[in-house]
Amino acid sequence: MSPIWSNWPGEQVCAPSAIVRPTSEAELADVIAQAAKRGERVRAVGSGHSFTDIACTDGVMIDMTGLQRVLDVDQPTGLVTVEGGAKLRALGPQLAQRRLGLENQGDVDPQSITGATATATHGTGVRFQNLSARIVSLRLVTAGGEVLSLSEGDDYLAARVSLGALGVISQVTLQTVPLFTLHRHDQRRSLAQTLERLDEFVDGNDHFEFFVFPYADKALTRTMHRSDEQPKPTPGWQRMVGENFENGGLSLICQTGRRFPSVAPRLNRLMTNMMSSSTVQDRAYKVFATQRKVRFTEMEYAIPRENGREALQRVIDLVRRRSLPIMFPIEVRFSAPDDSFLSTAYGRDTCYIAVHQYAGMEFESYFRAVEEIMDDYAGRPHWGKRHYQTAATLRERYPQWDRFAAVRDRLDPDRVFLNDYTRRVLGP
């Protein structure tokens, strides 16, 4: 009987022929080579934190949780080598012990390092690139069990954001930075003021993002500044109370909205009124990531920064015009361009607009309508979140698409690492 695997929200389910948990690079290479000889396909999985079926397979699934060690730390240069299954949540404190930290992070941290980088996971901050751009070298196990060390050239630029389509990354060497403190201030503002002053907020802060419930006229802005000051940690009990209140309040409101969709506008305004100002000063890895306990599904698009304000307003107008029962806020973030071939921020200053829906509520009509808006801006969907694009629609949005395809054809000509998702978004 085949094992059953599901992703973290339980929305993607598959039955691999086997789930294998290697604990060394040599074992990983052998598992891949043997599967390829049998004619089986292979996919690697870390935390299963993607909303798409990117990890699913009916072939051999490689569980990367046996490869989580920190292998080398060069404190003077900040170069840190970790195994491909290392979890961001564990890496933060491990680096902090050595007075180092990741330059930037997303707003959740259960992902594995290679799962996060393979999908171009990002944080916010217009002067900072996504996480994959911090990879200075990597080791890639190909379909034949060969281990490639990559630090330059097309293979390297393709492998940093690869969707797992080139092989399995056994190790990455990251460029880290000296340990720093992050000062975060959350403040409720009018949506009109937030949009009017958007460039000021984005350019005037190290990191800036904001959240808006589509039926409300307020936004929650989050500004963050870096420093070498000592942290002033929030007491554990106070942090726990705040997280439980925030997650519990959102959960209760979402459950009410799922049962009575027509009251979504009033619930949006209620949730907005519950948002309050707060300040945190702590080590960056404790501040970047927040606890998300309410189940949801998500789609996120990367568009040129200059189109962000207009695109957001169109999404809000869409929700209001169609009276859609949306219970989660829209999240807006920003990042610097980078040069990974399939990075969603390739070659342009980027605004990310993420839309969500509470688990168990209809989302497809909302997501498809938002996607149509993002198409007008050559939007690039987050590789690990829901979308409806195909290779045919995506190709023109990535200037280096053909260079990635050439690397894929050379490294995996027999498509050992193919699954339904990569077939759809990259082609057969």
Swiss-Prot record:
Regulation: Is completely inhibited by EDTA, N-ethylmaleimide, Cu(2+), Zn(2+), and potassium cyanide in vitro. Mg(2+) and Ca(2+) have no effect on the dehydrogenase activity, and 1 mm Mn(2+) slightly inhibit the enzyme (21% inhibition).
Swiss-Prot/TrEMBL keywords: Ascorbate biosynthesis, Oxidoreductase
Cofactor(s) annotated in UniProt: a divalent metal cation
Gene3D superfamilies, sorted: 3.30.465.10, 3.30.70.2520, Uridine Diphospho-n-acetylenolpyruvylglucosamine Reductase, domain 2, Vanillyl-alcohol Oxidase, Chain A, domain 4
Catalysed transformations (reactions): L-gulono-1,4-lactone + 2 Fe(III)-[cytochrome c] = L-ascorbate + 2 Fe(II)-[cytochrome c] + 3 H(+)
One of the record's GO molecular function terms: D-arabinono-1,4-lactone oxidase activity
Activity's dependence on pH: Optimum pH is 8.0.
Temperature curve summary: Optimum temperature is 39 degrees Celsius. Is relatively thermostable since preincubation at 60 degrees Celsius for 5 minutes results in only partial inactivation of the enzyme (53% of control).
Any one Gene Ontology cellular component term annotated for this protein: plasma membrane
Keyword Oxidoreductase on entry: yes
Bilayer-crossing regions: none
GO biological process, one term: L-ascorbic acid biosynthetic process
UniProt remark on cofactor binding: Divalent metal cation.
Entry EC no(s): 1.1.2.-
Pathway: Cofactor biosynthesis; L-ascorbate biosynthesis
Annotated FAD-binding PCMH-type domain residues: 12-179
Pfam families, sorted: ALO (PF04030), FAD_binding_4 (PF01565)
UniProt-listed PANTHER family: D-ARABINONO-1,4-LACTONE OXIDASE, L-GULONOLACTONE OXIDASE
Role this protein plays: Oxidizes L-gulono-1,4-lactone to L-xylo-hexulonolactone which spontaneously isomerizes to L-ascorbate. Can use both cytochrome c and phenazine methosulfate as exogenous electron acceptors, but molecular oxygen does not serve as a substrate. Is very specific for the L-gulono-1,4-lactone substrate, since it cannot oxidize L-galactono-1,4-lactone, D-glucurono-3,6-lactone, D-glucuronate, D-arabinose, or D-xylose.
Family named by the database record: Belongs to the oxygen-dependent FAD-linked oxidoreductase family.
Official protein name in the record: L-gulono-1,4-lactone dehydrogenase
